């Protein structure tokens, strides 16, 4: 695409203000990078990065992009683990970082937030009104509410306990790819029945429009109780989760696990005594103190079905925070000392143990690398297993990085198909398009392509993500 950068810079400056347009190479490279381990290609590097402040500026930007046929890539925080954030073609990156207003309406039962707010910022504001944000990404310090809702990710939250983000969305302000600004949903706390365009945009991964205002129901801040359980093996934790669903026991809000290796790494990193085996961490909630305490005691009794070495309610918040931090530190250790090639496996509950064993075999038998170490953790109660191939070096070729990413992606997605899963956390386009086709068929994929074309006839927004890439 032949673009006059000088003219582009001036044109964009008229829309968002020249101080909010960057076309220098260092900035463009930063916005092209994401969590993927391989090098950038020239096509990933945008012509310009713009930071609009409102829906009207975004509307003008998208109308301009349609006129010039220049792709626009939406950027929240760039934390996608399936390549959603890396531009697939040269174009304009639309950074939502300036859009950080939030308004809380307790008398109406909802709040409205702009997409550039980090999750932790929204939580802090809602806490002033004794309300909870029902979004739980591990990257809450940097993840934005716009990106989280656009992917509809549950992250740490167990879907069966509270639901997904979209279950709390009442409506949006959206700028369509062609520049029109629309309103969806309701200002009542009762969501629309029937055809509700709001649902088109929840989980749409930025393909159908730019979310510029998100209206969500206020959720009263519950009381929490935290539980930790130590087991000889990861299989004991898996058996407990399977039995929980079989008995119809209401799941905890959080139900995390560290396998034997991850538990050792994580606990050592935070200064805790090394556990004998695997570790499970749970958080239960209720809207009364007595209710949460009773729920925790009952769940603690249930946990003995899996014969834990020890299971206890952690009443000291500092102790709990240290235990909880061990999960993140297990991942940080791997990132510091080598490279990880990961997966998101969300099988049918009764196939959870089989999926775990198959994931171990995938890492053990990688064709592109011998002797990779298997390490796993994740949201086992959801259920989601993050199975990783850990390689204790960063000194591998760019081609090998791609090959390992692709091999882990394809083989773990085959497990999702084999065991009835989909992907409850990372989204379903970009690197997952081949899985989407295999799971749901070409007919459904073509329906999505036609839907995208109806909303975005010039394929302006997030071009390439629906086509798939590696």
Predicted features along the sequence, with ranges:
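C-terminal substrate-recognition/cap domain of FAD-linked oxidoreductases
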Residues: 23-34, 229-231, 238-403, 407-414, ...
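Short, ordered loop/turn segments at secondary-structure junctions
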Residues: 76-79, 99, 138, 260, ...
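Activity-critical C-terminal alpha-helical subdomain
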Residues: 180, 429-470
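FAD-binding subdomain of flavoenzyme oxidoreductases
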Residues: 100-105, 109-256, 460-461
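N-terminal flexible segment immediately upstream of the FAD-binding catalytic core
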Residues: 1-63, 80-109, 262-270, 317-341, ...
């Amino acid at each position: 695409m032949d673009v006059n950068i000088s003219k582009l810079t001036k044109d964009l400056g008229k829309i968002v203000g020249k101080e909010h347009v960057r076309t220098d190479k260092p900035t463009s490279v930063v916005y092209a990078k994401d969590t993927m381990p391989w090098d950038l290609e020239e096509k990933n590097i945008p012509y310009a990065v713009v930071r609009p402040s409102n829906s009207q500026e975004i509307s003008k930007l998208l109308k301009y992009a349609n006129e010039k046929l220049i792709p626009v890539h939406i950027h929240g925080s760039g934390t996608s683990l399936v390549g959603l954030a890396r531009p697939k073609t040269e174009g304009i990156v639309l950074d939502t970082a300036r859009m950080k207003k939030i308004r809380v309406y307790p008398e109406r039962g909802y709040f409205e937030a702009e997409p550039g707010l980090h999750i932790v910022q929204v939580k802090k504001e809602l806490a002033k009104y004794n309300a909870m944000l029902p979004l739980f990404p591990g990257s809450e310090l940097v993840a934005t509410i716009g990106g989280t809702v656009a992917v509809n990710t549950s992250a740490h939250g167990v879907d069966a306990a509270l639901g997904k983000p979209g279950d709390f969305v009442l409506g949006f302000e959206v700028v369509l790819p062609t520049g029109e600004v629309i309103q969806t949903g309701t200002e009542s706390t009762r969501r629309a029945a029937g055809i509700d365009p709001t649902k088109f945009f929840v989980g749409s991964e930025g393909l159908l429009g730019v979310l510029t205002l998100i209206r969500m129901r206020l959720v009263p801040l519950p009381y929490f109780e935290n539980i930790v359980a130590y087991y000889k093996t990861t299989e004991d934790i898996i058996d407990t989760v399977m039995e929980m669903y079989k008995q119809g026991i209401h799941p905890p809000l959080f139900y995390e696990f560290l396998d034997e290796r991850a538990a050792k790494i994580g606990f050592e990193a935070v200064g805790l005594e090394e556990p004998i085996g695997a570790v499970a961490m749970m958080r239960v909630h209720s809207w009364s103190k007595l209710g949460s305490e009773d729920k925790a005691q009952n769940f603690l009794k249930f946990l003995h079905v899996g014969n834990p070495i020890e299971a206890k309610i952690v009443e000291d918040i500092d102790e709990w925070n240290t235990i909880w931090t061990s999960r993140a530190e297990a991942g940080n250790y791997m990132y510091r000392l080598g490279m990880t090639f990961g997966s998101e496996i969300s099988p049918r509950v009764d196939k959870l143990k089989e999926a775990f064993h198959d994931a171990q075999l995938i890492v053990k038998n990688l064709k592109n690398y011998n002797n990779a170490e298997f390490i796993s953790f994740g949201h086992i109660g959801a259920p989601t297993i993050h199975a990783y191939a850990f390689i204790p070096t960063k000194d591998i070729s760019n081609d090998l990085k791609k090959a390992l990413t692709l091999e882990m992606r394809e083989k773990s997605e085959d497990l999702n198909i084999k065991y009835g899963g989909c992907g409850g956390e990372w989204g379903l386009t970009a690197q997952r398009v081949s899985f989407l086709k295999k799971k749901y068929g070409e007919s459904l994929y073509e329906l999505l392509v036609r839907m995208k074309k109806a909303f975005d006839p010039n394929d302006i927004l997030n071009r390439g993500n629906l086509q798939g890439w590696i």
